[in-house]
Amino acid sequence: MTLTQEKRSYMEKLSDENGIISALAFDQRGALKRLMAQYQTQEPTIAQMEELKVLVAEELTPYASSMLLDPEYGLPAAKHLDKNAGLLLAYEKTGYDTTSTKRLPDCLVEWSAKRLKKQGADAVKFLLYYDVDGDEEVNQQKQAYIERIGSECKAEDIPFFLEILAYDETITDAASVEYAKVKPHKVLDAMKVFSDERFGIDVLKVEVPVNMKYVEGFGDGPIVHTQDQAANFFKQQDQATPLPYIYLSAGVSAKLFQDTLVFAKESGANFNGVLCGRATWAGSVKDYIEKGEAAARQWLRTEGFKNIDELNKVLKATATSWKER
């Protein structure tokens, strides 16, 4: 990969001394509200969301190479990162329009790459829903949108992390067997599209190419892929892009995510780290809502630390430096 000196220095800040990105993701907004709402009757407040993000930043960034936050509720937390941790800021609005299958991208209207950089970001992250087999007119809109963000990041000389969430316009349940069958094609082909230089992307944040719950030996439901088939998809994923790529945890358990990383490595995926969110911190939400700040801190110092420490050990054994791509 070719990086300007400025972008390279930001990438160094976001990764550890071995060039591995062990980033903590807490840019959840809608998903966080829904999690909190499970444990209280009233609507979660802005103050609650901001405070929990601060707690997670204070307690867990000493063990992460960087943290991803949103500029809506995450700016207080951005001031509480460990001194060695880098900062990624999300540029997209949360969620998507559920009345349509288009899932068009949308920036936070009062933000720009320039403003995110001024706020202290070491990288701009943008989430895109993409169906490679979807409406061509819609996909051209999405590609043009990403080109614009790439140009912004190039102008500001700041790394651009594109998070791709693949989907199928005709399948409503992403957890279904039906979608599991087409997921490898959806994930891999979307990666190929956005590896084109014209998008100006520096790192791809991607899903693993299969739903591990339907892989032989990993789940207790129906089997969609044998382990050999799944391994082949991981190998294909590594060949799908010349760019550094990191895995998102997609809300799965810490254990399944760690097992998946080991499987990925054994299959020949030379991934460059993770942006791991709920698998690390989700358990703190219940304690925070029901018992308060001290209980949430205690959970983060014990269970949260255990999650991130185990993940770091797995990463050390499985991930490779982004400098090698």
From Swiss-Prot:
Q: What is this protein called?
A: Tagatose 1,6-diphosphate aldolase 1
Keyword NADP attached = no
The record's catalysed reaction(s) read: D-tagatofuranose 1,6-bisphosphate = D-glyceraldehyde 3-phosphate + dihydroxyacetone phosphate
Write out the pathway annotation from the protein's UniProt entry.
Answer: Carbohydrate metabolism; D-tagatose 6-phosphate degradation; D-glyceraldehyde 3-phosphate and glycerone phosphate from D-tagatose 6-phosphate: step 2/2
The biological process GO terms on file are: 6-sulfoquinovose(1-) catabolic process; D-tagatose 6-phosphate catabolic process; lactose catabolic process via tagatose-6-phosphate
PANTHER family recorded? SULFOFRUCTOSEPHOSPHATE ALDOLASE
**InterPro entries associated with the record:** Aldolase_TIM, DeoC/FbaB/LacD_aldolase, LacD_aldolase, Tag_1.6-dipho_adolase
| Top-tier EC class | lyase
The Swiss-Prot or TrEMBL record describes its family as follows:
Belongs to the aldolase LacD family.
HAMAP family (alphabetical): LacD
Q: Which UniProt keywords apply?
A: Lactose metabolism, Lyase
A molecular function (GO) term: tagatose-6-phosphate kinase activity
Q: Which NCBIfam families match?
A: lacD, PRK04161.1, PRK12399.1, PRK12858.1
Domain of life, per UniProt, equals Bacteria
Q: What is its EC number?
A: 4.1.2.40
Per the UniProt record, the source organism is Streptococcus mutans serotype c (strain ATCC 700610 / UA159)
